[in-house]
């Protein structure tokens, strides 16, 4: 069963484990990884890991939500236009919300925020972004005294706004990693013919993705972890 499905999921072992588990596979994710490394993959010499400063872990859903924009890959767009995926990742549960737009501007960012607040199953205390002009005017010398539409909307909602340091995308690492996962699990396997078509496909993927286990959640899904928190909040 592993040998038959491995070629399809070799770049995403969590998806392989989830697929096998639905078919009655009982070994743990780590057990599956050990089997594959021993029997199916050549040994790879690991380089020394970089040591970063400790990062304060979010203790409850909504305490901090990372938001970022991803360029939709041109190889899956048939009409030659440019599209952008807005993504929000809750640091505590890894619950994720995504939408697609045909521009990345402060107007699109504000619209995404409105929809995020409506769809979020928890109250959002703080939002973190990079310093892109679709979010903030802070790096524009002529406009730095005036907040963007996105920033003003955050004020209206009473949501704390945090901008990461310039040129440190790792500080928004959870949403950055989710974008890499979305590239492999979604965009490399889809074709979109219009903005409406892309939005429908992304909406289905968004619902499905929150039920996929994650190693950082002890092999539970974001929805499973979220339900545990909501039961005691």
Where in the sequence are the language-model features?
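Basic, flexible linker segments flanking DNA-binding modules
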Residues: 1-73, 133, 145-148, 226-230
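A short acidic/small-residue loop/turn micro-motif
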Residues: 90, 102-106, 143
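An active-site-proximal beta-strand-loop segment
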Residues: 67-96
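Mobile genetic element proteins and their domesticated derivatives, centered on retroelements
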Residues: 2, 16, 32, 68, ...
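RNase H-like two-metal-ion nuclease catalytic core shared by retroviral integrases
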Residues: 129-131, 140-144, 148-155, 159-184, ...
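Short small-residue beta-strand/loop micro-motif enriched in glycine and branched aliphatics
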Residues: 95-99, 162-164, 188
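Active-site beta-loop-alpha junctions of metal-dependent nucleic acid enzymes
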Residues: 98-126
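C-terminal domain-tail junction helix/linker
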Residues: 159, 180-233
């Amino acid at each position: 069963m592993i040998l038959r499905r491995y070629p399809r999921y070799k770049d995403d072992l969590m998806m392989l484990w989830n697929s096998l588990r639905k078919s009655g596979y009982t070994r743990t994710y780590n057990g599956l990884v050990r089997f594959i490394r021993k029997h199916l993959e050549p040994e790879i010499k690991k380089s020394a890991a970089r040591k970063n400063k400790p990062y304060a872990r979010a203790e409850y859903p909504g305490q901090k939500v990372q938001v970022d924009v991803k360029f939709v890959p041109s190889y899956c767009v048939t009409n030659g236009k440019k599209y952008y995926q807005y993504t929000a990742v809750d640091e505590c549960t890894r619950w994720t919300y995504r939408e697609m737009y045909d521009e990345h501007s402060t107007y699109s960012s504000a619209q995404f925020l409105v929809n995020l607040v409506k769809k979020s199953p928890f109250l959002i205390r703080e939002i973190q972004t990079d310093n892109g002009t679709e979010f903030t005017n802070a790096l524009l010398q002529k406009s730095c005294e005036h907040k963007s539409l996105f920033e003003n909307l955050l004020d209206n909602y009473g949501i704390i706004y945090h901008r990461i340091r310039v040129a440190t995308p790792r500080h928004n690492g959870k949403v950055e990693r989710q974008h890499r996962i979305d590239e492999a699990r979604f965009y490399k396997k889809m074709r979109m013919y219009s903005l409406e078509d892309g939005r429908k496909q992304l909406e289905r993927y968004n619902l499905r993705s929150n039920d996929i286990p994650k190693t950082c959640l002890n092999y539970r899904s974001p929805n499973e972890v979220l339900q545990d928190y909501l039961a005691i909040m």
